[in-house]
Amino acid sequence: MPPPPPQRPASSHVGRANLFSASPPPLSNRRYPHHRSLPLPPVSPRRRDPKKHSQQPSQEEPTDSGPTRTVTTNPAFRAAHLRTAYRKPVPPAAAAGEGEALLAADPTDAASGRAVVVGPSGLSFRLPGAPFDFQFSYSEAPRAPPLAIREPAFLPFAPPTMPRPWTGKAPLLTKEEKARRRGVRLHTPLGQETPQTVSAHGIMMEVRERRKMDLARVSPGDGRSREEVLGEPLTPSEVRALVKPHISHNRQLNIGRDGLTHNMLEMIHCHWRRQEICKVRCRGVPTVDMKNLCYHLEEKSGGKVIHRVGGVVFLYRGRHYDPKTRPRYPLMLWKPATPVYPKLIKEAPDGFTKEEADEMRRKGRDLLPICKLAKNGIYITLVKDVRDAFEGSDLVKIDCEGLNPSDYKKIGAKLRDLVPCVLLSFDDEQILMHRGKEWKSRYSKPLTLIPKVPKNNLAMTSVMNSSDEVSDANTQVAIREVLRPKMFKLWKSAVDSSLALLLDDAEANNLTPDSLLTLVEEFSVTSQAVEHSFPALLVTNGDASTDSLSAEYMNDEPETSVAGNEEGQLEQSPDLRDDEHFDVDMFERLESSVPLGSLPIDSMIERLNSE
């Protein structure tokens, strides 16, 4: 490489004149005189002052043999992290959801059975001796197999699993630990002689050290099954006694957008160590599918959901639970990177062309949303509301203004699987859905108040016809839907609960205004009697005795049998995860019904009538 051409000295201020046309050559190496480096080209004084900066190292490689300096860096310092563009596709079988792929960054981990599993359930971590594969989130894992991973296959557990050197500082010793280092016994066991050992510093007393915490410990428990730990089912009175003290208690486990995470299992067992009930408060995305959340709470923790009100779940540990022999799982030291999943929004969704999808998206811009979701709200009825909205329209939009983008995308993915529906757009913080071409109504034929009437009976209709043509007499008027399916369901529930009266065709044809008024008055009395039948405290006067009232109450077979059947059904309910079971308020449940004429107001009326 020829030396650079000489340059003229650059102009400088007074007192700072550049006396050299180029930078002075570096000094020769006294130890290795042959190792000389060529001078670097001069740098403009405007950009860099040579007096304030040191010379750059030599770029010439040594020609003679000499001591070489090898740079060894740990792979953890150049490992991929959240800001690196790491992407590794998973095997085709795992991406198609047909099997699992085992990945391991360290050969020793693969030989010991420690591996990262990529399969239909997402990204999980397998450890030897574990009862199940660990995941970061058990309830919010997508139901689609991942396409690629965003970080190397490292296990997010104990420090020995990651090749990272110790670069921190040892914690300060406490007074007790310093005493242990000096060999001073803090207490002497009764009835035992202290063993002594001789060392270079004199007589040192053996002291039992503190047990070290094993972050990678995996213990499935004492081998008992979940049914053996739970024991016999709880009676309604026991459930009431367990749940009531925790209703207004603030000692609870909060579940947010990530759902039931792995480290929450340890927190649940910490709650169970001091109390039999663990109160779980759910907000946000997991409340869309509370059945799924309750299922994973029971399966992963081993407990039993005995009561649920809205987004609050009460988890029971079991009759034979022992904190000393409980299962122990390692803690995740960091949140693993989320894998790459298929896109939720497609240009041409399943069953539609691109032109049809674009047309539906244009219609959805002017569509009014059926509801607006609040941040960290409770969305228990969202699936039902979307299903009811699809009964009247093929497009449904939900307003998610103010929510995190990842939140309403997770909500859309849940609605796609639970409703089911076809996702069209997430634009403008709105979830736009279509009910799909294979949609079928959940209700029977809608109820109508106008029966089929032959057109020949409607003279006014034929006269008012603009075409002045009378159609065939056998043709009938098309049915006009007076009640929508949702309103029909409300009417049906009102009739079943004796809050509404349904008349057949014969009664409706013979109905007159006077008879209608009489019928309404009779029904109002009956509905009030049904509505106001509730347990009350029986207060009797001196004439009537409590024995006669209790005997009359016990002899009332129909009402007591109905109440007994209702209580038996609640006790023998096999599936406590059903929403209908949890909607029952167990603290205001009707345990019995009072016979007619036994209320205090009835005794007062009888006394006034006799006077």
Curated annotation (Swiss-Prot):
InterPro entries: CAF1P_plant, RNA-binding_CRM, YhbY-like_sf
Principal localisation: plastid
Domain CRM: 232-328, 350-446
Residue ranges of the region described as CRS2 binding: 486-509
Gene3D superfamilies membership: YhbY-like
SMART domains, sorted: CRS1_YhbY
Protein name: CRS2-associated factor 2, chloroplastic
